[in-house]
C-alpha cells in the first residue's frame, strides 16, 4: 500500500466482553459499558506504527477508522452510543440496531435494561450523559452544558462528530 492510498478491510468476529468489576467497562448483571472492545488498526506515522503501553484504556493509539456495528438486544433494553443509528428494526423478541461512524478513533456503546442517560441538544452537538447531580435542575444543567460546548468550541475547535457520550463509569 503506497502513501496516500487506502484499503477497505471487513472483519467479522466475536468479542469476549470482560466483567466491569475492576474498570467499570464491560458487563454486569443488566448492563454493558463497551469502550475499546473492537479491533482497530494502529496509527502509522513517520514510517512506523505508533506504540502505546496499554497500561490504561484511555491511552490507545488508534488510526482513524469507519465503523459499522449491528447489534441485537432484548426488547426491554436501551442502547446509547455516540455512533449514528442508521436503522432500527424490532420483532416480537428483540430490537436490532445498525450503527455507523466515520473518521473516528473510538466510540462508546452502552446497553442497559433501562437507560440511565439524558440527552441534551446544543446547536452544535447532541450530548448523552448519565452524570448525576441533584443540586441543579435539568434546565440549569442544559444551560451549563451548552456553555461548556461553546467554550470548548471557541478554545479548542468544533468537535468532529454530531454526538458525544459522557458517562459515569
Task: Report residues per predicted region.
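Extracellular/periplasmic catalytic domains that process cell-envelope and extracellular macromolecules
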Residues: 2-3, 62-63, 90-91, 121, ...
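Helix N-cap / beta->alpha transition motif
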Residues: 74, 113, 128-132
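Intrinsically disordered, low-complexity Pro/Gly/Ser/Thr-rich segments with frequent PxxP/GP/PP motifs
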Residues: 1-10
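Extended Gly/Ser/Thr-rich low-complexity repeat segments
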Residues: 107-121
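Extended, low-hydrophobicity, Ser/Thr/Pro/Gly-biased non-transmembrane segments
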Residues: 9-110
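Short, flexible loop/turn elements at secondary-structure junctions
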Residues: 1-2, 73, 103, 133
Amino acid at each position: 500500500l503506497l502513501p496516500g492510498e487506502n484499503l477497505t478491510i471487513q472483519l467479522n468476529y466475536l468479542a469476549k466482553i470482560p466483567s466491569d468489576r475492576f474498570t467499570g467497562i464491560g458487563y454486569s448483571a443488566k448492563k454493558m459499558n463497551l469502550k475499546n472492545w473492537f479491533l482497530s488498526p494502529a496509527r502509522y506515522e513517520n514510517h512506523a506504527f505508533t506504540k502505546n503501553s496499554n497500561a490504561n484504556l484511555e491511552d490507545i493509539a488508534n488510526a482513524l477508522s469507519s465503523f459499522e456495528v449491528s447489534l441485537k438486544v432484548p426488547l426491554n433494553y436501551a442502547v446509547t452510543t455516540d455512533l449514528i443509528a442508521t436503522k432500527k428494526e424490532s420483532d416480537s423478541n428483540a430490537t436490532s440496531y445498525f450503527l455507523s461512524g466515520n473518521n473516528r478513533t473510538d466510540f462508546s456503546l452502552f446497553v442497559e435494561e433501562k437507560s440511565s442517560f439524558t440527552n441534551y441538544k446544543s446547536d452544535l452537538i447532541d450530548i448523552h450523559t448519565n452524570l448525576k447531580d441533584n443540586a441543579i435542575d435539568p434546565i440549569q444543567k442544559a444551560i451549563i452544558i451548552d456553555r461548556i460546548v461553546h467554550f470548548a468550541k471557541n478554545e479548542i475547535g468544533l468537535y468532529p462528530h454530531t454526538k458525544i457520550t459522557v458517562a459515569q463509569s
